[in-house]
Design a protein with these regions (language model features):
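Hydrophobic residues within beta-strands of alpha/beta enzymes
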Residues: 43-44, 136-138, 173, 239, ...
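Histidine-acidic metal/acid-base catalytic patches
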Residues: 2-11, 30-36, 80-81, 113-129, ...
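Active-site groove signature of glycoside hydrolases
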Residues: 124-147, 177
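N-terminal pre-domain/capping segments
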Residues: 1-118, 204-206, 303-313
Length: 314
C-alpha cells in the first residue's frame, strides 16, 4: 500500500536496497514495482565501478575498474517497465572496496582529468542505454583534494553535455557531501555553491547538492546546526535521510526535529532518499519522514534564516 505524500514539494526515492544486488545489480523492473507500491516517484540505481567479489567474478575486472559496455550487460537486467520511469544513477562514491580475499581498493575520483570524466560519463551512458531510457538524475561525489570546486563544476557541464548528445535530454546532477572528501561540511557546501553560481548561474536550476544528514553530522558533531545553517536552501535539490543507514528516530543524536524544520524552509521541489539497506527500513524511514513533515510544515519565506556570506575557497 502506497504512502500519502505529506508535502507536494517532496518526492521520495526508493533506495538501492541489498535485495536488488544479490547476483549483479538487477534492473528497473523489480525496483519500479516496489517503488510504485510505496508511493516513490524516483528510483535509485547503482552506477559504481567494480565494487565487490561477485562483480570481480562476473566481469573479470579488478576492484575499482570502470565498467565497459560488456561488463554492464553482465551486471544489469535490460529494459524498462515504462518509458516514463524516473531513476537516479548513484555513481562511484570513492570508498574502500574489498574483494573477499583480503585485498582492498579505493577508486579515485578525478574531476581534474577531463579524459577520466568522459570515461566516467560514458559508463553512466552505457548503463542508461541498457535500460533504454535516460536517467532523471545523476548523483556524484566530491573526491579528494586533488580536485577543486571548479573541476567539479566543469565536469558536471561535461557530463550533462554528453548525456544530451546521447539521449537529447539532460539529467539533473547532484553532488553529495562525503566524510573525508573536499565537500563534507556546511561551509564547504556553501563555498561550492558560490563557485557554481560564479561559473554558470544557469546551472543552479538543475544542479545542486543532495545533502546527506548523517554524513554532515559525522563530520560536524557539536557544530552540526551551525554547519547546517551555512548551507543555502536553494542549493539543496535532495536529501539522504538515515541514521548510519538505518531508520532514524527522534532519540538519535542527530536533532531530527530541527533538521526537518530546516527542510521546511526549502521553497522548491526536492527529493528525499531513505538511504537504508533493507526493504522494511525503507518503508519505516518514509513513515518517519512523513511524521516529521506533519510536525514541521513548510514555512513562509520571511521566516527563512539568513546565511553567512563567505568567500569561496576554490
Amino acid at each position: 500500500m502506497g504512502f500519502r505524500i505529506m508535502n507536494r514539494n517532496i518526492s521520495y526515492v526508493f533506495p538501492n536496497i541489498s535485495t536488488f544486488n544479490r547476483n549483479g545489480r538487477g534492473g528497473l523492473h523489480k525496483r519500479y514495482k516496489i517503488a510504485v507500491d510505496h508511493g516513490c516517484s524516483l528510483i535509485e540505481v547503482p552506477a559504481d565501478f567494480v565494487k565487490n567479489k561477485t562483480e570481480v567474478q562476473l566481469t573479470g575486472k579488478k576492484l575499482g575498474s570502470v565498467l565497459s559496455a560488456q561488463d554492464i550487460q553482465k551486471l544489469y537486467e535490460s529494459g524498462t517497465p515504462s518509458k516514463n520511469i524516473k531513476y537516479i544513477l548513484h555513481t562511484e562514491p570513492q570508498v574502500s572496496r574489498r574483494n573477499g580475499k583480503g585485498a582492498s581498493c579505493t577508486p579515485q575520483l578525478q574531476w581534474n582529468n577531463q579524459k577520466w570524466v568522459r570515461d566516467f560519463a560514458n559508463m553512466a551512458i552505457s548503463i542508461s542505454k541498457i535500460f533504454g531510457v535516460p536517467p532523471a538524475g545523476i548523483e556524484i561525489h566530491p573526491g579528494g583534494r586533488h580536485n577543486t570546486y571548479s573541476d567539479i563544476v566543469r565536469s558536471i557541464i561535461t557530463i550533462r553535455e554528453l548525456f544530451k548528445n546521447s539521449f537529447n535530454t539532460i539529467p539533473f546532477v547532484v553532488l553529495e557531501n562525503r566524510t573525508g572528501q573536499i565537500v563534507s561540511n556546511g561551509e564547504q557546501i556553501h563555498d561550492f555553491w558560490q563557485v557554481l553560481l560564479f561559473k554558470n548561474k544557469s546551472l543552479s536550476k538543475d544542479v545542486g547538492i543532495v545533502l546527506d544528514i548523517q554524513q554532515l553530522y559525522t563530520v560536524t558533531k557539536n557544530d552540526f546546526l551551525k554547519q547546517l545553517n551555512f548551507i543555502p536552501h536553494e542549493s539543496v535539490k535532495g536529501l539522504h535521510i538515515h541514521c548510519k543507514h538505518r531508520t532514524p528516530s527522534v532519540e538519535n543524536k542527530i536533532p531530527w526535529a530541527k533538521v526537518f524544520a530546516w527542510i521546511g524552509k526549502i521553497k522548491h521541489k526536492i527529493f528525499l532518499n531513505p538511504e537504508v539497506h533493507h526493504h522494511s527500513q525503507a518503508i519505516d524511514t518514509i513513515s518517519f519522514c512523513n511524521e516529521m513533515m506533519k510536525k514541521h510544515p513548510t514555512t513562509t519565506s520571511q521566516d527563512c534564516e539568513k546565511h553567512a556570506t563567505r568567500n569561496p575557497g576554490h
